[in-house]
Amino acid sequence: MIRRPPRSTLDRSSAASDVYKRQGDNVRDSTLYVTLEPCCHFGRTPPCTEAIINSGIAKVFIAVEDPDGRVSGKGVEQLRKAGIEVVLGPGKEETKVDLEAHIKLSETGLPFVTAKFAMSLDGKIASSSGESKWITSEESRMVSHAMRLESDAIMVGVNTVLVDDPRLTARLENRNVDRQPLRVIIDSDGRIPVNSSMLSEDGSTFVATARNVRFSDRIKNLSTRAFPDKKGKVDLISVLEYLGKIPVSSVFVEGGSEILGSLFDQGLVDKVAAFISPSIIGGTDSLVAVGGIGAKFMSDKYVLTGVKR
């Protein structure tokens, strides 16, 4: 293995270029295995196909054709025209899962959305007083941090910021984190406190509002934009479309209940990461994991597939 796959769209670079840079003529007449079709256009790096052709590699196994319109079979065509044997499809289904965010972004222009929540056995994410630390275990939180690190962005609603004052960073034991995900705050009226803990952390924060709001210029790495819907709330579809153009390919949504409910109501959730504690909180005033309108009939409920523990 020359290198591992990239963890996000924001830091994706060419594995094929790495092969040529690190190995030079040592790879001549060898076989290359890649998960995604090599790119054939100029971006942050030169075309991957150019590096492969120049390296003298004789055969390339490609698991998945890149649905990105700039590639979409053209990379394979360039390699074959250069006399390189190309084999498509080995490991395709497994690889499509690994590349699910890139595939969705390329096909729809929208990021892949993972809804994450930690709840009690009766579906509560906080007590009636609003207390939520901690429902699940330290081990669960470490898994959550690893999932943050794999994401381009972390999204929460402003109520989560006001109640919990989260740092919204990826923190792993015994490992330096060189890139923090973009923090996305859904905040209709611009209520995020300027002394929020996250604003002093590494990385950038983006506040999506429903009206034009100006924050202090002294706050570093903070940007904002209005996405009003007809009800005076933040238009979540417009936010996701905007993020997709950055490009942000994956969004890890950590609540709260209102944001998760809105995303489910609009059919914007692609994956669910539920951490369930063997505990009961109870109470009609305790927050449930997913708010919103919800399913009126059982036939309207979300049914999850590919469930893993």
What is the meaning of each model-derived region?
Residues M1-A16, Y20:
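Single conserved hydrophobic/aromatic residue that forms the stacking wall/gate
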Residues K21-G24, E100-I103, H145, L240-G244:
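Generic structural signal for well-ordered alpha-helical scaffold segments
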Residues V76, P90-A118:
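Proteins enriched for Cys/Gly/acidic motifs involved in redox and nucleic-acid/cofactor modification
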